[in-house]
């Protein structure tokens, strides 16, 4: 029921005048709640986590990074979510590169990167980024009703560990063939 209300809401929004904060507050925050994440729980949300960049190769014009969201499952970060402004419909490889730097930080070590500008949400596996323009899962306004269950299976606090386990088993099976 709540998922249906969210997808109905999603289909109606014009994100063209949304800045990054609007995307975060009006779209991502409710989505994280539906996915089962909440502050001060075992499946919590770390917001705007600031981290120091210590390695010279990490420092690309800055010494600190700030991660928009790092949802946790059993207090461990499996993924990060980076919000992007809605006034730019297409996210690009620069957005993914920024998020990759965040996800691979030694204090985070996330398995998945999620980029969201409201128009669409893209999920990348940190260890399987072969094509920077092709996420392993993408959902947009136009297909949110048909793909929301799959999004839930991948990112929800209840199902992510099982999804990750299946993904690892599949990769291992391919490797051992």
What name fits each language-model region?
Residues 1-112, 120-177:
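A short, conserved, highly charged catalytic patch centered on acidic carboxylates
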């Amino acid at each position: 029921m709540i998922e249906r209300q969210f997808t109905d809401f999603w289909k109606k929004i014009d994100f063209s005048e949304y800045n990054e904060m609007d995307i975060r507050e009006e779209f991502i925050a409710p989505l994280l709640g539906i996915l089962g994440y909440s502050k001060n729980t075992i499946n919590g949300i770390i917001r705007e986590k600031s981290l120091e960049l210590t390695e010279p190769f990490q420092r690309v014009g800055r010494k600190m990074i700030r991660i928009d969201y790092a949802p946790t499952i059993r207090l461990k970060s499996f993924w990060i979510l980076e919000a992007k402004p809605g006034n730019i419909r297409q996210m690009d490889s620069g957005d993914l590169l920024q998020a990759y730097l965040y996800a691979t930080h030694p204090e985070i070590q996330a398995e998945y990167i999620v980029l969201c500008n409201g128009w669409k949400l893209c999920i990348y596996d940190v260890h399987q980024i072969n094509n920077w323009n092709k996420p392993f899962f993408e959902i947009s306004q136009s297909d949110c009703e048909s793909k929301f269950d799959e999004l839930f299976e991948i990112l929800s606090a209840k199902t992510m560990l099982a999804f990750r386990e299946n993904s690892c088993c599949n990769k291992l099976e391919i490797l051992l063939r």
